Amino acid sequence: MMPAAHGMRSRFFGSRLARVVSLLLLAMLFGAPIAWSQRQRFMLEPNVPYDGRYTFVRLRYTQGYRMAWSADYPQMERNFMTILGDLSTLRLHKKASNVHVLDDPALNHYPIAYLTEPGYWMPTPQEAEALRRWIQKGGFLIVDDFYFDRQWDVFEKAMLSVLPTARIVPMDVSHPIFNAFFHIKTLVGMTHPATPLAKAEYLGIYEDNDPSKRLQVIINYNNDIGDYMEWSGEGWYPVNFSNDAYKFATNYVVYGLTH
């Protein structure tokens, strides 16, 4: 395991930025014109070649509801990478991101991947095996944007086809992922953008089902931090929800890069 989150924070981020980050987020959400939007026709952008910089990776599943994997793409990536790039010293691609199918060998270059709308995700046996190997080799999976029992049941079946012996367990705010950069004091408060009845829950899967070992998968259930980040400049959602989405996403990336 890599050094503790507190030590890694000083490596990647300036402490002064951390103290004033709330003001920065409020100031930056978002003056720049939005170049891409879901109002425009969907277009899959070309992947950037691996060059050692952090690249946001989204997973494209080939079975399930058509195009569900692409929710919030690519504006969410642009907004998040802008925030992360301005607040950190990470070398990253601000204006480019990658989309990989689950069994793409190129995925092995990247330590973190994002999977959205898993309530429609049905991996093939080949995809499940490839994703399992990626996770077991050290990959960190972020799962986002699904709510209520029906979507949970689909996700759980798919996830257990990837990690058959996995136990999906509730996360506690004391876990290092919630203090990887931002100090998140509570996991209560956010809801899924589609309905305030869906109260956010955070769950995880640990290596060997052992909470003392590496967290392999973080699950945002009854939440959609991608949507909050995508539309953070439009005024559709409460600013505190957009800010919280950036905080969770930033912590996930820092944790994934340091564990």
Predicted regions and their residues:
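N-terminal secretory signal peptides that target proteins for export/translocation
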Residues: 1-16
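Short alpha-beta junction capping motif
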Residues: 56, 112-152
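Extracytoplasmic/secreted envelope proteins and their assembly/folding machinery
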Residues: 77-81, 128, 132, 152-156, ...
